[in-house]
């Protein structure tokens, strides 16, 4: 592709950073990507939970490498459109619609997705530097830069994709707002389906394995479990989102967990033995207990001089058990790369402000229902009280069927006109 002359420093090499680096490279920008972890295995949350890539993100990544990435993802296509809800006795009480069929929807292990995306970035020759600690950063009217491992690096802009505890947030957003504990945490892990086949207590999760993916919710007064099968019936992943007794003093970083930690909040459930059969099959040392952090609405994602922008969890961490967080991160990456392409080297601050305008309102609307849904899931009544239906919070078409790339090209000039005219940009593709 032709070079745009735009140079970009991407901070963070989780899914947000990797996707940003790839999208910027494909648009002809020069990219250096920095990651403090020593290698890919230590980046962010590379654990054995699952990631839902919905159609809005699948249409982006499946095209990479002339379809090679899509081919690699095919083994993880999500072919189920319904979720089953069980009560704490093990009785199925509800079926809810969760997705429309699509060839670009994937339910994949996080580590597998990260590896596929990273391998593609390597084939493109992107400059990715692990073990890089940023000690300082700055912006001027014509450039931005970082001091990393004793070296100064400069570029036309910095894209901060370094997660909920972003190093650049204070200066970029002009806010001291810090993530706080939500009052919830979740323990996550996975197991091989093959390891469950001889256990009679695990047969309930094996129904249809290899034919259709299973998605099961078990809400209760002390925890809300999500159990899914994926990869053509090869894997089962599970999550226990539980209430934290003292969130103000609770840990704010991930720690190793055990099967007993996972089971502790559900000791009184009659369904416990069947759940335990699945959880105990997880490889030793593979479970992680992670606090769910939340961040209020930032006043801005773009720095005062327009040379730095926050994307992904650095700007809008997905609340609680959102199934769409990773898909929105991929959209962010695609949009900022397109805006830099259209604006060109001489208008980088404008490009970042346009990208913010296009994404800001949409992300705000995406997150409105998620805290409410999570609270409802922990207030589902139990059989002895009369079952209260599990809340359905549909993934609206303007989210799952959105084409962020087409939309960015269509809206770019409108947003530029609004910014230059000092008017508010009004998004029309949300409801």
Swiss-Prot record:
Pathway: Secondary metabolite biosynthesis. It holds the Pfam family FAD_binding_3. FAD binds at residues 35, 110, 313. Residues 1-21 form the signal peptide. The keyword Oxidoreductase applies. The keyword Transcription does not apply. GO terms for molecular function: FAD binding; monooxygenase activity. InterPro entries: FAD-bd, FAD-dep_Monooxygenase_BioMet, FAD/NAD-bd_sf. Its cofactor is FAD. Its EC number is 1.-.-.-. Keywords: FAD, Flavoprotein, Monooxygenase, Oxidoreductase, Signal. It is an enzyme of class 1 (oxidoreductase). The active site is at residue 188. FAD-dependent monooxygenase; part of the gene cluster that mediates the biosynthesis of the indole diterpenes nodulisporic acids (NA). Nodulisporic acid A (NAA) and its chemically modified derivatives are of particular significance because of their highly potent insecticidal activity against blood-feeding arthropods and lack of observable adverse effects on mammals, in particular the tremogenicity associated with the paspaline-derived IDTs is not observed. Belongs to the paxM FAD-dependent monooxygenase family. This is FAD-dependent monooxygenase nodY1. It comes from Hypoxylon pulicicidum. The lineage of its organism: Eukaryota, Fungi, Dikarya, Ascomycota, Pezizomycotina. The gene is nodY1.
């Amino acid at each position: 592709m032709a070079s745009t002359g735009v140079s970009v420093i991407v901070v963070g090499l989780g899914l947000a950073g990797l996707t940003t680096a790839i999208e910027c490279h494909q648009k002809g920008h020069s990219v250096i990507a920095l990651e403090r972890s020593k290698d890919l295995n230590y980046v962010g949350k590379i654990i054995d939970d699952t990631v839902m890539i919905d159609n809005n993100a699948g249409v982006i990544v499946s095209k990479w490498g002339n379809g090679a990435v899509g081919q690699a993802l095919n083994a993880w296509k999500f072919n189920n459109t319904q979720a089953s809800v069980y009560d704490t006795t093990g009785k199925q009480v509800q079926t809810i619609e969760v997705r429309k069929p699509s060839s670009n929807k994937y339910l994949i292990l996080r580590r597998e997705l990260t590896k596929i995306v990273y391998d593609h970035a390597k084939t493109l020759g992107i400059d990715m530097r692990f073990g890089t600690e940023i000690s300082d950063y700055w912006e001027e009217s014509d450039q931005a830069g970082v001091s990393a491992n004793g070296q100064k690096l400069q570029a036309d802009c910095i894209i901060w994709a370094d997660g909920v505890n972003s190093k650049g947030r204070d200066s970029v957003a002009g806010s001291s707002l810090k993530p706080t504990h939500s009052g919830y945490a979740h323990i996550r892990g996975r197991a091989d389906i093959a390891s469950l086949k001889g256990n009679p207590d695990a047969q309930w999760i094996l129904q249809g394995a290899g034919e259709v993916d299973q998605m099961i919710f078990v809400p209760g007064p002390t925890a809300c479990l999500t159990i899914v099968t994926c990869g053509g019936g090869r894997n089962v992943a599970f999550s226990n989102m539980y209430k934290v007794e003292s969130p103000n003093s609770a840990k704010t970083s991930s720690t190793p967990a055990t099967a007993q930690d996972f089971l502790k909040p559900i000791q009184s459930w009659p369904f416990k033995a069947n759940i335990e059969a699945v959880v105990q099959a997880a490889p030793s040392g593979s479970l992680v207990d992670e606090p769910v952090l939340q961040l209020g609405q930032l006043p801005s994602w773009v720095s005062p001089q327009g040379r730095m922008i926050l994307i992904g969890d650095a700007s809008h961490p997905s609340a609680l058990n959102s199934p769409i967080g990773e898909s929105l991160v991929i959209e962010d990456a695609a949009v900022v790369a397109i805006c830099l392409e259209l604006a060109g080297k001489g208008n980088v601050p404008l490009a970042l402000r346009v990208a913010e305008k296009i994404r800001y309102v949409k992300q705000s609307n995406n997150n409105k229902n998620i805290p409410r849904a999570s609270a409802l899931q922990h207030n589902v009544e139990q059989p002895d009280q009369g079952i209260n239906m599990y809340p359905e919070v549909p993934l609206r078409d303007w989210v799952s069927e959105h084409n962020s790339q087409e939309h960015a090209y269509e809206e770019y000039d409108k947003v530029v006109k609004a910014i230059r005219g000092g008017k508010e940009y009004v998004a029309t593709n949300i409801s």
